[in-house]
């Protein structure tokens, strides 16, 4: 069963492992911990399948703008719609928290991410 929830500090090691599998320059564990340590201007969510974290997404909330920082899904779970569902939920949570605009940066070479963002509108 799929579940999307707010990330907690207890999720740091799982998020760190997803970082290692997903990015050529992943965040260090210390960076993941710093992002999860409860600052009101940070929002991180995880997506779980059968109680295992398969992806995460995060945003920084500044005034009325959300800046999506990272979206990552473990390689074995990619192409199953998890990224889209998680991104939609993250955007909804940003809007609930009063964000008027939401931004992200993506490499032009990241074709899978570009396709997902286009499909999300």
What would you call each of these model-derived segments?
Residues 2-4:
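Extreme N-terminal starter segment of soluble prokaryotic enzymes
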Residues 6-76, 87-93, 97:
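Acetyl-CoA-dependent GNAT
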Residues 14, 115-116:
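Well-formed, non-transmembrane alpha-helical positions, independent of function
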Residues 74-80, 108-110:
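Active-site acidic-Proline motif in GNAT/NAT acetyltransferases
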Residues 87, 110-113:
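Short glycine/proline-centered loop/turn elements that form peptide/ligand docking sites
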Residues 94-105, 116:
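Conserved GNAT acetyl-CoA-binding A-motif
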Residues 118-121:
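Conserved acetyl-CoA-binding loop of GNAT-fold acetyltransferases
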């Amino acid at each position: 069963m799929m579940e999307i929830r707010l990330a907690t500090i207890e999720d740091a090691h799982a998020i760190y492992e997803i970082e290692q599998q997903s990015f050529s320059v992943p965040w260090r564990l210390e960076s993941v911990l710093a992002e999860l340590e409860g600052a009101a201007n940070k929002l991180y969510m995880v997506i779980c399948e059968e109680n295992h974290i398969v992806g995460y997404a995060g945003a920084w909330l500044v005034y009325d703008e959300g800046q999506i920082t990272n979206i990552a899904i473990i390689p074995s779970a990619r192409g199953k719609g998890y990224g889209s569902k998680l991104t939609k939920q993250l955007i909804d949570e940003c809007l609930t928290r009063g964000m008027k605009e939401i931004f992200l940066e993506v490499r032009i070479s990241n074709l899978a991410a570009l396709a997902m963002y286009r499909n999300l509108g």
